[in-house]
Design a protein with these regions (language model features):
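C-terminal extensions of enzymes
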Residues: 1-15, 23-32, 39-40, 143-149, ...
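Non-catalytic, usually N-terminal nucleic-acid engagement modules in DNA/RNA processing proteins
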Residues: 1-183, 296-299
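Conserved, mostly hydrophobic/aromatic
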Residues: 21, 54, 89, 131, ...
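Alpha-helical packing segments of well-folded alpha/beta enzyme cores
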Residues: 127, 158, 162-165, 169, ...
């Protein structure tokens, strides 16, 4: 259930309530693909750095340790000892991005595992069943993820099939939630808008899926080849047709600047591997811009990663020390940097929410949208 508390322009300040708590929005979901954050962060760490929602991956957990094992362990919350909300993606993106050997049919997709090459089938019903076994609070519809740009005729064909798959997802989600032994009978299904960079196809698809009256809607298929401006144009085209009383989720996006600009265009939920992935390569975010900690100029730098940051890392360690850890290939380097970057993203969302509460979001946007994209 989503409650809109305040708005400034199209930017929205709200609350989303599910079986495992209430989420303050706009929010960034911390990505734990296989039930853990890459970089050795635990569920306890996530609490300490302000994470509200954890995101895990259906495809990867289906392969290892298998969703049936997770179900036997009591569901993903119990398995990873995380008591907050969890969103699971449908596995569609990974099926289409990781497997070069795949065959798309009306019933679903036949593909080869990227781990051992074994043949696997996944369709709308299978995706819903896997996510039901995981017991997430939010499950995402199974969809086809296409590259940008793609031929218009193929995009239209793909979107029509994705719509039919969503109808099947909705029916299967309702069936599974009604079972007496289901892990999370309050699991919510969110639909995904597709259509590549064709605004008219996007708008038509959004209108059709809005009629299905789902608890939330995502804009998918972006940040996969188009420019930032093309992405913003798509959001602006689709947003007027997204139900105002439902959550809006921009999948796989993005940089701090992308997030600020998408909030300004009416988006509530975000996820991206960027903060953790960049951290693992010593590329860090700060309130003055992006830092590459491997640069020689930090070798004798006694200051924290970001003097304006109060994360556990910045309160204790110097740039020089963390740089040394990277050069020495110590695992602690990744842990500290992932912790800092995720804290930064969670703090960014907190500051956006505070700005919306105080009616100062546009001023915040003017101050930080361009600044956070700089390299220093």
């Amino acid at each position: 259930m989503f409650t809109l508390k305040k708005a400034e322009g199209k930017a929205r300040r709200g609350e989303f309530t599910c079986a495992h708590g209430t989420v303050q929005t706009p929010v960034f979901m911390n990505v734990g693909t296989q039930g853990a954050i890459k970089g050795a962060l635990s569920a306890e760490d996530l609490k300490n750095i302000g994470c509200q929602v954890e995101l895990s991956n259906t495809y990867h957990l289906h392969l290892r340790p298998t969703d049936k094992v997770v179900r036997q362990m009591g569901g993903l919350h119990k398995f990873m000892t995380w008591d907050g909300p969890i969103l699971t993606d449908s596995g569609g993106f990974q099926v289409f991005s990781l497997s070069s050997l795949r065959k798309i049919k009306e019933e679903g997709v036949y593909f080869a595992s990227h781990i051992d090459g074994r043949k696997i089938f996944m369709g709308p019903e299978e995706s819903m069943q896997i996510q039901s076994n995981l017991g997430s609070d939010i499950c995402m519809a199974f969809d086809e993820c296409i590259e940008n740009p793609s031929p218009r005729d193929y995009v239209q064909k793909s979107v029509d099939r994705t719509y039919r798959w969503l109808v099947r997802c909705k029916a299967e989600n309702a069936r599974l939630n009604a079972l007496p032994d289901t892990v999370n009978p309050q699991q919510m299904l969110w639909g995904i808008n597709q259509g590549g960079t064709y605004a008219d196809i996007r708008v038509d698809h959004m209108k059709r899926i809005a009629d299905l009256d789902l608890p939330g809607y995502a804009i998918g298929g972006l940040a996969v080849g188009e420019t930032a401006e093309e992405m913003y144009d798509i959001i602006e085209a689709v947003e007027p047709h997204m139900p105002k009383e439902k959550t809006r989720y921009l999948m796989g996006v993005g940089t701090p600047t992308n997030i600020i600009e998408a909030v300004a265009r009416g988006v509530d939920f975000f996820d991206c591997v960027m903060p953790a992935r960049n951290a693992r390569h010593a590329r860090l975010f700060s309130w003055e811009g992006a830092i590459n900690l491997k640069n020689a100029k930090y070798q004798l730098d006694e200051g924290p990663i970001d003097p304006k940051c109060d994360c556990p890392v910045c309160r204790r360690y110097s740039r020089a020390y963390i740089r040394h850890l990277f050069i020495a290939e110590e695992m602690l380097a990744m842990r500290l940097c992932v912790m800092h970057n995720l804290y930064f993203y969670n703090k960014l969302m907190e500051r956006i929410r505070n700005a919306l509460d105080e009616g100062g979001f546009e001023a915040f946007r003017r101050e930080y949208s361009e600044k956070l994209a700089k390299r220093i």
